[in-house]
Structure formats: structure tokens, C-alpha cells
């Protein structure tokens, strides 16, 4: 898995970028959100997801980890492939998408090209609890920096646990139990170790 690519921005297009890393150009598909974040930077660091099919290996890129996390949530839902997930993230930024899911706004999600009523309902059904939980964590401005740090570490720990063989459901449950009501700051290593002890 290629976690991120850092290098010179050789080409930028609303649907893809080319990043030059020591003379090798990586073609990376991006959303409009990421495209707008890159602006005209000379050097970029893009978080990536490598999608492997029999006939193609495709890199998808994200300006930040929140967008990558939303992409992975979307592609975990039946009927939504990487291409459709990118269209969703081009239609609204990650925060807008989280809010639409949390308030169960079927109409907004269904307005995205390629998303029908049943798929929009499935997105809400499968992700609403997670989005509402995130919204509570980020509830007040005074806790905002803490929640961003918490969510970032949680996201990285979740990826690590899945790589170690946990199902996503079990990994999320363990992490939420550890973090619930605990105001102490965790290091990524501590969080993973505690989750492993719960298996």
C-alpha cells in the first residue's frame, strides 16, 4: 500500500494530478476538493489509496486524511466504487458530507450524480452513527484541536488494526470503547496496544 506521495506537482487537472518523484511521474486521480486545495503549490504531499483490479492499478489521492477516511467509508458500502466515491467528494467537501449523513439528508446525498435513492439511504444507514459520533467529539471549539488529534490518531489506529487482521467493525468497537469518556491523550502506539489487548 502506498500511504502518500510527496514530490513536485508536474501537472494539475480537475480530475487528476501528476506528481514527479525523482523523475517518475505518478498519475493520481483526485476530487475537486483536493484539486482546489493544491492550488499552484510547487511541492505537494498527497495521501493515497491504491485500487487494484485485474486490468488496472489506480492511485486515488487526497489533500488530507479526513477526505481519505471518507473515501474509504464510502467504498465500504455496497454499490459505491472508487470512481463514484470520488464523484461524491467532488460534489461536497468531507465536512459537508459528514454533516449531510449525520442529519440523514437523503436529498443532498441523492443529488450526486450516480447516487440513487437506495444507495443514498444505504450511505446514511451504514455511516450515520459514525458521523454523529464524530460530530459529538468535535462538539465545541474548546475541544476542537483535541478532537482533530483524537480523530486522526483513531483513523490511523483503525487502519493499522485492519491491516493486522481485525474486521473494521471489531476494530471500531474496540477503539471507541477505549476512547469513550477518556480525556487523556493517547499516542498511536498506546491506542493500538490497548485495542490488541481487547482481542
From Swiss-Prot:
Principal localisation: cytoplasm
Pfam name, any one: HHH_5
GO molecular function: ATP binding; four-way junction DNA binding; four-way junction helicase activity
Protein known as: Holliday junction branch migration complex subunit RuvA
Keywords: Cytoplasm, DNA damage, DNA recombination, DNA repair, DNA-binding
GO biological process, one term: DNA recombination
Region: Domain I, residue numbers: 1-63
Gene that produces this protein: ruvA
Region of interest called Domain II, as start-end residue ranges on this chain: 64-142
Subunit structure: Homotetramer. Forms an RuvA(8)-RuvB(12)-Holliday junction (HJ) complex. HJ DNA is sandwiched between 2 RuvA tetramers; dsDNA enters through RuvA and exits via RuvB. An RuvB hexamer assembles on each DNA strand where it exits the tetramer. Each RuvB hexamer is contacted by two RuvA subunits (via domain III) on 2 adjacent RuvB subunits; this complex drives branch migration. In the full resolvosome a probable DNA-RuvA(4)-RuvB(12)-RuvC(2) complex forms which resolves the HJ.
SUPFAM superfamilies named among the record's database cross-references: DNA helicase RuvA subunit, C-terminal domain, Nucleic acid-binding proteins, RuvA domain 2-like
Region named Domain III: 151-199
GO CC terms: cytoplasm; Holliday junction helicase complex; Holliday junction resolvase complex
Ranges for region Flexible linker: 143-151
Compartmental location: Cytoplasm
Amino acid at each position: 500500500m502506498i500511504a502518500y506521495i510527496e514530490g513536485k506537482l508536474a501537472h494539475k487537472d480537475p480530475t487528476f494530478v501528476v506528481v514527479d518523484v525523482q523523475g517518475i511521474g505518478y498519475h493520481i486521480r483526485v476530487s475537486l476538493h483536493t484539486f482546489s486545495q493544491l492550488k499552484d503549490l510547487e511541492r505537494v504531499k498527497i495521501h493515497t489509496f491504491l485500487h487494484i483490479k485485474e486490468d488496472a492499478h489506480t492511485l486515488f489521492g487526497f489533500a488530507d486524511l479526513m477526505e481519505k477516511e471518507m473515501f474509504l467509508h464510502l467504498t465500504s458500502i455496497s454499490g459505491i466504487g472508487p470512481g463514484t466515491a470520488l464523484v461524491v467528494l467532488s460534489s461536497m467537501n468531507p465536512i459537508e458530507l459528514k454533516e449531510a449523513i449525520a442529519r440523514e439528508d437523503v436529498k443532498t446525498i441523492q443529488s450526486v450524480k450516480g447516487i440513487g435513492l437506495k444507495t443514498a439511504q444505504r450511505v446514511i444507514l451504514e455511516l450515520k452513527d459514525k458521523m454523529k459520533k464524530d460530530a459529538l467529539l468535535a462538539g465545541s471549539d474548546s475541544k476542537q484541536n483535541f478532537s482533530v488529534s483524537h480523530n486522526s490518531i483513531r483513523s490511523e489506529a483503525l487502519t493499522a488494526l485492519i491491516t493486522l487482521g481485525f474486521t473494521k467493525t471489531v476494530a471500531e468497537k474496540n477503539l471507541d470503547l477505549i476512547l469513550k469518556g477518556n480525556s487523556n491523550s493517547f499516542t498511536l502506539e498506546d491506542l493500538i496496544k490497548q485495542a490488541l489487548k481487547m482481542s
